[in-house]
């Protein structure tokens, strides 16, 4: 298996969020790198960034560095273009795991890989998700996953829904090439019950710091 880590340093909401200190002297990248090295060889890890300073971080762990075109950064990037640019240079025909560093609390990679090995013949991809139990309304206040009045259902009886965590995706190489997306057409849902905080804003960063520190004892 090859691992791809997309690592932007140009976040407009949190400056250098992926490489600034998060816990003690470790950045979000450092934390994820150490988690990955618990189950994968460093030569199988490929890090894509628009900033050449990240190469020094990759050298520290023995990871492969891929310099990214700045045009493939930001929130307006066409996802298939990004997926293709980051996965085409990765050698081999084995599976690809796409791992984000912005979810430091997620560390169930070993269990996910074991489950993937068991279901790989029946699915083209794996996506890490968390069960969602809540009552949803659209922007016109119409119920989405339940009904008002007599037909109301308590949360325990709502139809199963899942939140994509953006922490881990695993895809067969042919699925990556064909669909050029994080998820194939027949994904396996890897369900985690662990607390997960995806860091998009400064408040998320600070909250994740508190929780991560608590979990470290």
Residue ranges and their predicted role:
Residues 177-197, 202-217:
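Catalytic donor-sugar/metal-binding loop of nucleotide-sugar-dependent glycosyltransferases
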Residues 1-15:
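N-terminal nucleotide-binding beta1-loop-alpha1 segment
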Residues 52-97, 105-107, 111:
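Short phosphate-binding loop-to-helix
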Residues 101-193:
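Conserved core of the sugar-phosphate nucleotidyltransferase
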Residues 21, 47, 98:
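Conserved SAM-binding loop
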Residues 45-49, 128-129:
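Short internal beta-strands
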Residues 17-23, 70-72:
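Short glycine-enriched, charge-decorated loop/helix-capping segments at active-site entrances
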Residues 27-45:
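A short, N-terminal amphipathic alpha-helix
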């Amino acid at each position: 298996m090859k691992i791809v880590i997309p690592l932007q340093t140009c976040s407009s909401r949190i400056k250098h969020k992926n490489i600034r200190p998060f816990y003690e002297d470790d950045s979000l990248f450092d934390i994820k790198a150490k988690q990955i090295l618990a189950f994968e060889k460093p030569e199988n890890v490929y890090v894509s960034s628009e900033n050449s300073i990240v190469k020094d971080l990759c050298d520290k762990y023995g990871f492969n560095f891929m310099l990214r075109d700045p045009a493939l950064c930001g929130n307006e990037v066409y996802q298939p273009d990004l997926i293709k640019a980051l996965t085409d240079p990765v050698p081999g025909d084995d599976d690809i795991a796409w791992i984000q560093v912005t979810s430091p609390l997620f560390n169930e990679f070993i269990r996910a890989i074991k489950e993937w090995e068991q279901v790989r013949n029946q699915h083209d991809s794996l996506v890490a998700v968390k069960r969602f139990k809540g009552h949803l309304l659209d922007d016109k206040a119409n119920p989405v996953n339940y009904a008002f009045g007599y037909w109301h259902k308590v949360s325990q009886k709502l139809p199963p829904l899942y939140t994509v965590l953006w922490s881990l995706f695993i895809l067969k190489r042919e699925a990556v090439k064909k669909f050029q997306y994080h998820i194939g057409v027949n994904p396996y849902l890897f369900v985690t019950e662990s607390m997960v905080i995806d860091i998009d804003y400064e408040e998320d960063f600070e909250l994740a710091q508190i929780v991560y520190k608590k979990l470290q004892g």
